[in-house]
């Protein structure tokens, strides 16, 4: 995975956690962040990328 994209995901997950969001809310925010950073990615691809980071 692209390290910059991974950083976007980790930052979004951290921000969502700090805001008190649950797992689903954190994932949703991270997917939106991925789509802003990489508009060429579909929602499905963005979700896959977020899930890969969750598993690490």
Task: Label every PLM stretch briefly.
Residues 1-56:
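C-terminal alpha-helical interaction appendages
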């Amino acid at each position: 995975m692209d390290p910059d994209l991974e950083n976007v995901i980790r930052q979004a997950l951290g921000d969502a956690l700090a805001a008190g969001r649950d797992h689903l809310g954190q994932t949703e925010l991270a997917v939106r962040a991925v789509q802003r950073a990489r508009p060429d990615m579909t929602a499905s691809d963005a979700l896959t990328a977020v899930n890969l980071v969750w598993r690490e």
